[in-house]
Amino acid sequence: MTNKTWGGRFKKSLDSSVNQFNASLSFDHVLFDQDINGSQVHVKQLAKQKILTEAECQEIYSALEEIRTEIKQGQYSFNERDEEDIHMFIEQLLIQKIGDLGKKLHTGRSRNDQVALDLRLYTRDKGCLINELLTRLIDCLDDLTSKHQQDLMPGYTHLQQAQPVTLGAYFNAYQCMFSRDKSRLEDWFKRMNYSPLGAGALAGSTLPLDREWVAESLGFAGIIPNTLDAVSDRDFVIELCSVAAMIMMHLSRLCEDLILWSTQEFNFVTLDDAFATGSSLMPNKKNPDVPELIRGKSGRVYGHLMAILTVMKGLPLAYNKDMQEDKEGLFDTINTIIVCLQMITPFLQSLTFNTPLMRTKAQSGYLDATAILESLVMKGMPFRDAHHQVGAWIAEAIEKQCSLNELLKGG
């Protein structure tokens, strides 16, 4: 018999290398707050259903709160423990504090529904924070839209000057993109906010559990009715990672423009000293590290999305140990998108835009060609003929080194 909580049927101790390979405490300890919240509601339910006494419930509840405080105060080193994961870590601390009563905590529960609950609570908490940060970014873009609604600049396709737009319209485009991202995040929240607790390992429990009461107590919209589904899917993790990848894609595109605009060749934007870095060799340099890092970090978020999709694609129902691999990528995705959103808003607010140069560029370079084409169409000329005619005028203007308006007025 081993000293593991699940070791009753085993005659040999777990090989130390397997124990180390199997462990996830070094990274899943970030779930401690959610794990304790879930356990506290679970024991209150056990008392409500007369499976535990009120006195037992209160003693377990209070001891769990003490453990939460001790973890927050840094009293434990997660890298020096033998427990497999944060769930076993907290349970063992509980048993050390209150003895055999602590062994009743896991009554009516499996780690399968326990970890599914913890992940839903964790992603819900972090999803709310991401939503708040998105709102701040959208508000910032709205301010920039209003501030620059009259400031002309060149619009680009293929990174070539195309038609005049306003700087305000540019920022409004990203405001629209991030608003859709916010909508996606809120849609995800509606789908994921259901409780798996009470699903057990895969087939529920013979104990008279009240799953609906637990769900309501933890702020869920309801329960996941199918217990197999409750413990076996991580689509809510995948969907959050997908939304995060979309947000990072939009952030990366925004940053790409700002990086280009900050070059001497464009000179559309000046970086604030507080949000730029220098070179260890070249004293003339002022580098856009903030947007470059955000652009670069998009790759790791994409990678984590592909990783969890690949982990899940071939798993039979219900739970499999493969699913432990959902966490590190999820945690890094969340941490990455939070820090990027925290940086981008003050970075945008710090920028100085060279609007006179933008206007000059918008009024040169034949950006008025499409408007002239359409004026010919309005006079009755077929579109293709008008397109050909304006193209010929542009070729002539380039040869004469004058603007299109100057050419037409001279003609």
Swiss-Prot record:
Coarsely, its chief localization is cytoplasm
What subcellular locations does the record give? Cytoplasm
Cellular component aspect of the GO annotation = cytosol
Read off the Gene3D superfamilies from this record. Fumarase/aspartase (C-terminal domain), Fumarase/aspartase (Central domain), Fumarase/aspartase (N-terminal domain)
Instruction: Report the pathway entry.
Output: Amino-acid biosynthesis; L-arginine biosynthesis; L-arginine from L-ornithine and carbamoyl phosphate: step 3/3
GO terms assigned for molecular function: argininosuccinate lyase activity
What EC identifiers does the entry list?
4.3.2.1
A single BP term in Gene Ontology: arginine biosynthetic process via ornithine
What keywords appear on the UniProt entry?
Amino-acid biosynthesis, Arginine biosynthesis, Cytoplasm, Lyase
Q: Which InterPro entries match?
A: Arg_succ_lyase_C, Argininosuccinate_lyase, Fumarase/histidase_N, Fumarate_lyase_CS, Fumarate_lyase_fam, Fumarate_lyase_N, L-Aspartase-like
Which reaction(s) does the protein catalyse, per the Swiss-Prot or TrEMBL entry? 2-(N(omega)-L-arginino)succinate = fumarate + L-arginine
On whether Amino-acid biosynthesis is a keyword of this UniProt record, the answer is yes
Q: What class of enzyme is it?
A: lyase
PROSITE patterns from the UniProt entry: FUMARATE_LYASES
Which residue ranges traverse the bilayer? none
Write out the similarity annotation. Belongs to the lyase 1 family. Argininosuccinate lyase subfamily.
Record-given protein name: Argininosuccinate lyase
Q: Can you name the source organism? A: Legionella pneumophila subsp. pneumophila (strain Philadelphia 1 / ATCC 33152 / DSM 7513)
